[in-house]
Amino acid sequence: CGVDDKRWLRCFLEFCRAEGLRPDHITRHHYTIEPPERDGHYGYPKLSDPETCLATLQASRDIVDSFAEFRGLPIHVTEFNTSYSPTTPLHDTNLNAAYIAHQLSRLGDCNESYSYWTFGDVFEESGVPFTPFYGGFGLVADHCIPKPTFWTFAFFKKLQGTCVHRSQQAVVVRGADGRYRGVAWNPAEGGGEALSLTFALPFA
């Protein structure tokens, strides 16, 4: 899961080298919380620093590329989310949506693909949900209710074109028709602070 790349990933590739094997690709997971505090049925984790989390993905890339025969092998993040627990109210919040927006803006830098865990809150390992919002993994709550993070993905889906701006708070692209589209986020907890952004965009 990317927890101990230096041991498991490097050892795996050393084994492949010794046995004359070549993997088609490398897979890993990506979750971005500290161990949660439990309160009854729920877990309340603290979000990890996003840059620190992204650095772990780059570490996987660097380990793979340190082997000449495996350099450039695609890495697929087969699960990612903030929390790995299906009873985390964070999943149902605007904060989750904003944090995931930042992750989406960067996950493609060193990964071939990345798959959000998961689409719906009906999670087979936990059975049928007992309420529409119970902290499940999904983008969509029980009864087909889109959660805030669903809209993050919907907005990013519309970002097709050439990226002309990317920062810690926003991404802007210019489409073939010359129009600009962007997504901005503000992962502030509680009352939070207002966010003011200024963009300098090319017109040519």
Each model region followed by its residue ranges:
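Noncatalytic carbohydrate-binding groove/subsite architecture in carbohydrate-active enzymes
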Residues: C1-E112
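Glycine-rich beta-alpha junction loops
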Residues: H30-T32, N81-T82, T118-F123, A188
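A Trp-anchored, charged/polar loop motif used as the substrate-binding/catalytic surface
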Residues: L54-A55, C163-Q169
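Substrate-binding clefts and catalytic carboxylate motifs of secreted carbohydrate-active enzymes
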Residues: T87-D92, A97-I100, L104-E125, C163, ...
